[in-house]
């Protein structure tokens, strides 16, 4: 055979599963963030029957080193450079990038020739549109001064012996056969004039080695300058292995030799160009929606609030009592913060006046249960939302108990819901509706957030907790009252029956209520965090009172009142001991609540003090003429 220049085929062809890009998205958001430094990738060599080269497959496990722990497969370790901007991807000097990676492989190969095999991926991930652009390179290099020519090609005798050796030594790409036909690992000192070189070959083209042979032969020649002719066995897993007799020219003896490089993968049209993929149409839309919804939240952790705990928010089970204007806006804000479990409770139905003020309803919902319609709307907005609507009459203090059996069922259902959830939002229309949930929320040690509206004012507050510091416990919605709540719903005119308020007030109160809730979750003390402490989001106020007539917001703090009708120690302890029996009487008779809490005694003392202060002097002689 005449002497000829050796031709090479591509060593690998890459294949990417959609799970790879899904995992890249997750890691970019949660781990890599703004970093565009190299991240390790792991892949296995898979023989191909139809392609001219072996395959490297990439999936969601390719970021995990355990994915190549299989002793029966040949693995390759590489890296991915994911750019933060598409401009970074486009402006990258691809030739220099490949040159740098080739030098890395060259230097690694000088220490261990088996490490001269690698791959590298450059990419840009558009996480909003779920589109990805990427390009893979397999660094092939050859010494500029080295010429490799072939003088003969023959079949390999007893090839099974060499195949078995490579199958038993999966991490080895190059080995040596000595004069006694014994196979051993390659080292620059182990080769002599009677030795032959064995190379694991991933090419499928007849008598054509993969381009990785250039890497190995360049390193071999650099370490064995005196060798000018060599017999190389290219060992494949099928029956197409072959032997080549090669001539290696002299090379420049340089400390840092120059390399000729290649290796960017061609696209399906045979052109050197990156590939792109749009996963928005290929994977489960619900999965895309779930990751997309979390996108803005996870971006907070990149720069602005790296220590914020988003998982603790997502895991909350929130009970919203009242599915009106406040309930609708609070639900939307909670959903935006990543809460996935919401239960809405209301006893009303949607009226034609509701949809313009209550964003979870529309014209066609008229007459439907508010709670159920709101929950259905949340699921339409985001199908992965676990939203439930419960139509329920919350027992109200000061209202006549007309049907004890029904009211007891309502009480038991409310108690069940409170036990099942972590946080309660009190967003009902009347004060007396909030009394029982306030009491039960304290007993069950839940986070309770309260929001209430006036015409041009609002109140947002977090309730203190019975189980907290007795001396510094924060007050609840009823701690400023000197009487127990009574029936405020009977005998009202139309303007009193409807929530008459400036439309923007509800949005302001709702958003603040949710922000207070999120801030509480950032501290392990939850209910018991004081107003003097700060979380990663800043302060956690007790009360916020806003006034739109002069556009001011007051940040207030009031301690728990020892005689509070809802959260005082006597009320909580009696409720714990007697349960429904006490509550049944308390709902019908607010004066009982005043007696138990001590409010009645306080009122008596105030009246006695007032009587003494205004005790008129009846003795005319003691009158002073003015």
From Swiss-Prot:
Active site: 498
InterPro entries on file: Atg7, Atg7_N, Atg7_N_1, Atg7_N_2, ThiF/MoeB/HesA, ThiF_NAD_FAD-bd, Ubiquitin-activating_enz
Motif GXGXXG motif, residue numbers: 322-327
Pfam families per the UniProt record, alphabetical: ATG7_N, ThiF
Primary location class: cytoplasm
Keyword field: Autophagy, Cytoplasm, Protein transport, Transport, Ubl conjugation pathway
Family the UniProt entry places it in: Belongs to the ATG7 family.
Known function: E1-like activating enzyme involved in the 2 ubiquitin-like systems required for cytoplasm to vacuole transport (Cvt) and autophagy. Activates ATG12 for its conjugation with ATG5 and ATG8 for its conjugation with phosphatidylethanolamine. Both systems are needed for the ATG8 association to Cvt vesicles and autophagosomes membranes. Autophagy is essential for maintenance of amino acid levels and protein synthesis under nitrogen starvation.
Free-text note on domains in this protein's UniProt record: The GxGxxG motif is important for the function, possibly through binding with ATP.
Subunit structure: Homodimer.
Record-given protein name: Ubiquitin-like modifier-activating enzyme ATG7
Source species: Vanderwaltozyma polyspora (strain ATCC 22028 / DSM 70294 / BCRC 21397 / CBS 2163 / NBRC 10782 / NRRL Y-8283 / UCD 57-17) (Kluyveromyces polysporus)
This protein's encoding gene: ATG7
């Amino acid at each position: 055979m005449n002497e000829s220049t050796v031709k090479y085929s591509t060593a690998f062809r890459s294949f990417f599963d959609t799970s790879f890009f899904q995992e890249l998205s997750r890691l970019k958001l949660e781990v890599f963030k703004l970093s565009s430094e190299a991240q390790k990738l792991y892949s296995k060599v898979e023989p191909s029957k139809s392609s001219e080269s072996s395959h490297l497959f990439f999936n969601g496990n390719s970021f995990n080193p355990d994915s190549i722990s299989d002793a029966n497969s040949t693995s390759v370790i590489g890296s991915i450079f994911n750019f933060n901007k598409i401009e970074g991807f486009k402006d990258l000097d691809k030739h220099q990038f490949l040159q740098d990676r080739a030098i890395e492989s060259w230097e690694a190969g000088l220490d261990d020739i088996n490490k001269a095999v690698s791959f590298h991926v450059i990419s840009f991930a558009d996480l909003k549109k779920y589109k990805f652009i990427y390009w893979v390179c397999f660094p092939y290099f050859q010494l500029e001064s080295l010429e490799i020519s072939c003088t003969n090609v023959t079949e390999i005798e007893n090839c099974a012996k060499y195949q078995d050796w490579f199958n038993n030594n999966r991490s080895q790409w190059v080995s040596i056969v000595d004069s006694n036909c014994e196979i051993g690992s390659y080292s620059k000192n182990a080769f002599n004039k009677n030795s032959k070189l064995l190379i694991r070959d991933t090419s499928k083209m007849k008598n054509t080695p993969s381009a990785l042979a250039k890497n190995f032969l360049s390193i071999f020649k650099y370490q064995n300058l005196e060798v000018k002719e060599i017999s190389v066995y290219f060992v494949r897993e099928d029956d197409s292995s072959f032997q080549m007799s090669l001539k290696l020219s002299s090379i420049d003896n340089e400390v840092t030799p120059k390399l000729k490089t290649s290796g960017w993968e061609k696209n399906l049209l045979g052109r050197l160009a990156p590939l792109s993929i749009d996963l928005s149409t290929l994977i489960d839309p619900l999965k895309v929606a779930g990751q997309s919804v979390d996108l803005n939240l996870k971006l907070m952790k990149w720069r602005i609030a790296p220590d914020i705990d988003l998982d603790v928010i997502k895991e909350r089970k929130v009970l919203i009592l009242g599915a009106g204007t406040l309930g609708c806006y609070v639900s939307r804000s909670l959903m935006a913060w990543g809460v996935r479990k919401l239960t809405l409770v209301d006893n009303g139905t949607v009226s034609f006046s509701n949809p313009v003020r209550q964003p979870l309803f529309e014209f066609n919902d008229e007459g439907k249960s508010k709670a159920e319609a709101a929950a259905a709307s949340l699921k339409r907005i985001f199908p992965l939302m676990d939203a439930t609507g419960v139509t329920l009459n919350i027992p109200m203090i000061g209202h006549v108990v007309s049907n004890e059996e029904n009211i007891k069922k309502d009480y038991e259902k409310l108690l069940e819901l409170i036990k099942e959830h972590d946080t309660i939002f009190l967003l009902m229309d009347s004060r007396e509706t909030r009394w029982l949930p306030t009491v039960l929320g304290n007993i069950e040690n839940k986070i309770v957030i309260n929001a209430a509206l006036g015409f041009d004012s609002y109140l947002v507050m977090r309730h203190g907790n019975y189980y907290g510091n007795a001396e510094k416990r924060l007050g609840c919605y009823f701690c400023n009252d000197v009487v127990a709540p009574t029936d405020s719903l009977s005998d009202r005119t139309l303007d009193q029956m409807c929530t008459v308020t400036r439309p923007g007030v509800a949005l302001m109160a709702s958003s603040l209520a949710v922000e207070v809730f999120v801030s509480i979750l950032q501290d392990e003390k939850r209910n018991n965090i004081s107003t003097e402490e700060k979380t990663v989001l800043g302060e956690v106020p007790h009360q916020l009172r806003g006034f739109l007539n002069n556009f001011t917001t007051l940040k207030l703090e009031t301690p728990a009142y020892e005689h509070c009708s809802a959260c005082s120690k006597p009320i909580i302890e009696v409720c714990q001991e007697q349960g429904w029996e006490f509550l049944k009487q308390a709902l019908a008779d607010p004066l009982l609540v005043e007696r138990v809490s001590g409010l009645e005694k306080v009122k008596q003392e105030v009246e006695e003090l007032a009587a003494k202060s205004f005790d008129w002097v009846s003795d005319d002689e003691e009158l002073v003429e003015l």
